Amino acid sequence: MTTLEEISALTRPRHPDYWTEIDSAAVDTIRVLAADAVQKVGNGHPGTAMSLAPLAYTLFQRTMRHDPSDTHWLGRDRFVLSAGHSSLTLYIQLYLGGFGLELSDIESLRTWGSKTPGHPEFRHTPGVEITTGPLGQGLASAVGMAMASRYERGLFDPDAEPGASPFDHYIYVIASDGDIEEGVTSEASSLAAVQQLGNLIVFYDRNQISIEDDTNIALCEDTAARYRAYGWHVQEVEGGENVVGIEEAIANAQAVTDRPSFIALRTVIGYPAPNLMDTGKAHGAALGDDEVAAVKKIVGFDPDKTFQVREDVLTHTRGLVARGKQAHERWQLEFDAWARREPERKALLDRLLAQKLPDGWDADLPHWEPGSKALATRAASGAVLSALGPKLPELWGGSADLAGSNNTTIKGADSFGPPSISTKEYTAHWYGRTLHFGVREHAMGAILSGIVLHGPTRAYGGTFLQFSDYMRPAVRLAALMDIDTIYVWTHDSIGLGEDGPTHQPIEHLSALRAIPRLSVVRPADANETAYAWRTILARRNGSGPVGLILTRQGVPVLDGTDAEGVARGGYVLSDAGGLQPGEEPDVILIATGSEVQLAVAAQTLLADNDILARVVSMPCLEWFEAQPYEYRDAVLPPTVSARVAVEAGVAQCWHQLVGDTGEIVSIEHYGESADHKTLFREYGFTAEAVAAAAERALDN
């Protein structure tokens, strides 16, 4: 634990010359509002918001370039509260700074319908750049924002001197001990150093307290040394009240352009709560009436009043609105001059901000003739990306060290990064479009979210479907935010083959479909893959993330695939030859991905027995379920109860479509190491097995 002498030193104020009583009053107002808000609702995290009051005030009032009247301003700095549990750190600044929150919003913290939920939520509260809460996600996504900032500069103003472009800005982060402990920050921080992201500035709130009290029980590393080892520019500031040290550290960080900056700020959580500061009780619970009253006495507030904000303090802090508009106007002059110099790039920017695609963007998408050589859908996806590359400069992405397997490299594209990281295989350029995440799947997921949140580009990232488990927290958060990240997940079943059960997805499709707002797209062949990419890219921001599920093994190019049908999520691929117009089939075979070919073959076998089967390709359950019921009933007539679902995964998500009398051809156990043909045969994925299931469904 921290000694009393150390606490005294760490809480000794050091203010710059311009600092006045009104600045001190504003900081104390932040502390009191944080204590009052948590006390009123009875739960929350007051301590960090109290001890970080000087830092938050300095960042929002004195450091960041932003405009409270336009929270979507292209030239703004971004702020990421990775320590999302300390949401009051952000909310109170948004209130004091005039971003759209009022005192009543602070008073309604963590209550139904409020603008101030327990953790910051993107799209919910004006001024919140990203949803945070699961620790580590914010810092990792901030790395993506910094990468997106550089790529944006490369698209629109690549030749400007550092700091001279209207597209230059900073990404500021506040991270906690918990963020530092999470593995995703290690992954992302390592990559940030490789990328030399000089516009990324992270404040690490080193208060050494978590829910279980003193972090020494679980964290005893020299974190600053770890970040130096990564290759970051590292500074250490002693004391959360040391505004001089904070400002000097920010200035030093801004001067370093070839490395991300890490500022370890040693604070005392809960300061100035006399009995609970520097304890776990200040971290995640209300302080209690007596302790809150004591805090107010210490800072000169009336202990009997709540939510006190002096009028002169609010007038002072909301001066940020005018200052922000002035900064915006100065930036606009630079931006307008750039627009006059670069009319073509300005037109591109306008298109991206409007979320529009260029005319003819999909004209060169590849098409494969039915019956042509079998092709893995991952290979088809790679061909699609290379065809789209010249038309869509906003599209960029890569893989978690599996580019050759995932087929995620756009033909002819340089790698994104400083030229110094170039290898024999890859040529890196500051503004390249091929991303190399390394074996860092979790960071990749979070970084993709940061890229998309920053805008205005589209990003994708690939790995094996099995390793989507490593990405799941980031994928869920992207779905919660309704952002349009794209995940390319290949090697999608036991069809992966010889690598065996550790790498063969079994439960993954159902597990991913369980995430609300995530669209899971598993095309049947090369053409459905092209149609899937077309649909994904045509969707506007706010339509949610998409996981594109692709095969390792070759699959036949099918007859009857349909672009509109893919966009609807499911469609009639073929009806048995004997069916008359308007006549219903005897049985419906519903399949996805590589198993659609089995349904087609089973349809022929059933026809030999005078059973008329319909084959429905269902690349995306989520898109299909969003269709009007008239369309769904036309594809799956309710009167046809004999149904079979075929998918090389667990059956969990298919019961709703096949009903009690239907059958599911699935796999409910782990696989083995063998070639894919053997595995499919031994585990019952054959046309004969599908036909037999159809006959059972008819008998049910």
Curated annotation (Swiss-Prot):
It comes from Mycobacterium tuberculosis (strain ATCC 25618 / H37Rv). This is Transketolase. GO terms for molecular function: magnesium ion binding; transketolase activity. Thiamine diphosphate binds at T48, H85, G133, P134, L135, G178, N207, H283, F467. Substrate binds at H45, H283, R378, S405, H491, D499, R552. The gene is tkt. Keywords: Acetylation, Calcium, Magnesium, Metal-binding, Thiamine pyrophosphate, Transferase. Homodimer. One of its GO terms (biological process) is pentose-phosphate shunt. The record marks H45, H283 as: Important for catalytic activity. Its cofactor is Mg(2+); Ca(2+); Mn(2+); Co(2+).
